[in-house]
Amino acid sequence: MSAQTQRADPARLLVLVADDEPPIRLLCQVNLAVAGMDVLQAADGGEAIELARSSAPDLVLLDLMMPRVDGWTVAEELGADERTREIPIVFLTARATTEDRRRAEKLGALGYILKPFDPVRLAPLVTQVVERCARGEADALRKERSPQLWPADLEG
């Protein structure tokens, strides 16, 4: 399905899920679709960059450890491109170190969700982030550090 077809209903959010694990992509796809969102899937970082540039999703759920191009590089590339720099990024990862979380903050991520995660809570979090960004509240969202979007420091 083309990105234009997926944008046929502008009222529906379009989320790009970039993760090399098919079960994670499927879990996100099902839960976001049930909530009325359209979902694009990328199995590696290179594909994620291409889809973000060609489809302009409302949000990217981004794994860190992917083949070809890792999530860090994807976030850097999207942030450097004027076509994609305003797309909110929420990391969805098993990497739980404080250093990784801080690096995500520096890259401008709006969230850092640890795997395993509660899939039922995913759609409400995505909706919250997209709506707040649409109201110009991205900086406030970064500063709030909601426990649903940012885990507590793990190393003190």
Please tell me what each predicted stretch does.
Residues 8, 131-156:
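CheY-like receiver
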